[in-house]
UniProtKB/Swiss-Prot annotation:
Name of the protein in its database record: Matrix remodeling-associated protein 8
Originating organism: Gallus gallus (Chicken)
Source lineage: Eukaryota, Metazoa, Chordata, Craniata, Vertebrata
Topological relation to the membrane, as annotated: Single-pass type I membrane protein
SUPFAM superfamilies, per database record: Immunoglobulin (SSF48726)
Membrane spanning residue stretches: 340-360
Presence of the UniProt keyword Disulfide bond in the record: yes
Cytoplasmic side of membrane: 361-437
Description of how the protein assembles with itself and partners: Homodimer in cis. Does not appear to form trans-homodimers.
Gene for this chain: MXRA8
Length: 437
């Protein structure tokens, strides 16, 4: 019984401490430095749901199953030569494909290096330039997977004088003045690994949510969620935290990694941060939210009593002829009742323990009485034995007294008879014989 009580107490203590210790899963400190994109204060009422937004279109996973990064380069020209302004696509090339030259006129006349996506040299070569080639050229690099777009603009002017041929920077773009009929090279070099390398996709794209309770520095933050583009999802901490704080399943499909915290409590206050890492695309962003929980506005308990006479039958699903009682309890009350429930449950447990303890002590004391009674009983037996002895004695005594009442001679006779019966007779005979003589 005593052991059971101890066990119960231990269990109670363990339950309370587990809540504290399971919560402190450390966040990975080895994250590369992220750019803090935003710091926001968010306050929400207790019991409500808070949404901490964290969205980035660049984190959308395009599931490039071809293992081709969907990198593409295209050269366009903005020309005013024919009087009207027009934009024309000259050529393009995919990272895992051949280059396409759009007009037949340019076929064989303009070209890009075939190894552009391994070398990072996307420069355009135009042979036999004509006056009609004048215009603003743009080298466009698109990385569909990383949602990156880069453009380099170069202005090409044609001159008929060899002396006038030159290259300069006009403050916005490079300007090349080329001699008519010559071969020009419009430079577009980008050796950033994003444009030249291949990586394994899934491991490179990860989203973390961290939480710092008030007063805890960022390097000791608790990790809440890790989410990988491959679909792997890791949640940390006790189950109630995992159920309470979650991000949607479609996060990588929509680029929405917003954290939803349901049933806000005061204990949920703290600093939350969303880390978006796209290692391949070089994206490292951090969004910070300070969450404050405010007391809900005190609602008055509303008891709405409506008799069936006055109740308007708007909803056909509602059963008619019943009194409708709407009882609205403010959420703070619900919280209060929860707390009360906890307190009562704990109290009940202690009462049970107390009863057990009282029971044990009572049992012990009872055992003590029995022991004493047994001793008494033994003594009684002794006393009985003694009384038996004394009665015997009195019997003897009363006999003696009876003997005293009798004649002394008789007594003597009796004594003599008792001690020497045969001899007495002999002596008597002898005495009589002597007397008769
Ligand atoms: C957020 O709240 C903190 C503490 O109350 C305050 O110091 C800070 O100025 C607030 N920041 C913003 C952006 O409101
Ligand atoms: C890029 O390629 C063009 C054409 O092949 C070449 O003329 C140029 O030197 C290259 N540039 C670099 C920086 O390698
Ligand atoms: C979090 O949300 C996802 C998708 O909505 C769900 O599959 C998962 O079970 C949730 N996690 C917990 C611990 O409730
Ligand atoms: C009471 O309930 C009725 C319908 O059930 C509604 O029309 C009315 O507005 C309610 N009154 C209050 C004070 O909530």
């Amino acid at each position: 019984m005593e052991q059971l009580a101890k066990l119960l107490l231990w269990q109670l203590l363990l339950q309370q401490s587990s809540v504290v210790y399971l919560y402190s899963v450390p966040a990975d400190a080895s994250n590369p430095d992220s750019v803090v994109v935003s710091v926001l204060n968010i306050s929400a009422t207790r019991g409500s749901q808070a949404v901490l937004p964290c969205k980035s279109y660049r984190m959308v996973w395009t599931q490039d199953r071809l293992n081709d990064r969907q990198r593409v380069v295209h050269w366009d020209v903005y020309s005013t030569y024919y009087g009207d302004n027009k934009m024309e696509r000259l050529c393009d090339m995919y990272s895992a494909g051949n280059q396409r030259v759009y007009s037949s006129y340019n076929q064989g006349r303009i070209l890009m290096p075939q190894n552009a996506f391994t070398d990072g040299n996307f420069s355009l070569v135009i042979k036999d330039v004509a006056e009609s080639d004048a215009g603003v050229y743009s080298c466009n690099l698109h990385h569909h997977y990383c949602h990156l777009y880069e453009t380099v603009k170069i202005q090409l002017d044609i001159t008929k004088k060899a002396k006038a041929a030159k290259e300069y920077w006009d403050g916005e773009k490079a300007v090349i003045v080329a001699l008519e009929g010559s071969t020009v090279m419009l430079p577009c070099v980008n050796r950033n690994h994003i444009w030249t390398e291949r990586h394994s996709e899934e491991e490179q794209q990860v989203v973390h949510w961290d939480r710092q309770p008030p007063g805890v520095p960022h390097d000791r933050a608790d990790r809440l969620i890790d989410l990988y583009a491959s679909g792997e999802r890791r949640s940390y901490g006790p189950l109630f935290i995992r159920q309470k704080m979650n991000i949607t399943d479609t996060a990588f499909a929509l680029g929405d990694f917003s954290l939803r915290i349901s049933e806000l409590e005061n204990a949920d206050e703290g600093t939350y941060s969303c880390h978006l890492h796209h290692h391949y695309c070089g994206l490292h962003e951090r969004r910070i939210y300070q969450v404050f929980v405010t007391e809900p506005v005190r609602e008055k308990k509303v008891v709405n009593l409506t008799t069936h006479n006055t109740a308007p039958a708007i909803d056909p699903n509602v059963v008619r002829g019943h009194n409708v009682i709407n009882v609205i309890i403010p959420e703070s009350r619900i919280h209060f009742f929860q707390q009360l429930g906890y307190v009562l449950a704990t109290l009940l447990l202690f009462v049970v323990l107390l009863i057990i303890v009282v029971f044990i002590t009572r049992k012990r004391r009872q055992r003590g009485y029995e022991y004493n009674v047994k001793k008494y009983g033994e003594k009684d037996v002794n006393l009985k034995e003694f009384t038996v002895d004394t009665t015997d004695l009195t019997q003897y005594k009363s006999e003696d007294i009876r003997l005293d009442y009798k004649n002394n001679i008789l007594k003597e006779k009796a004594e003599q008879a008792r001690s020497f019966p045969a001899k007495n007779i002999d002596l008597d005979k002898d005495f009589r014989k002597e007397y008769c003589k």
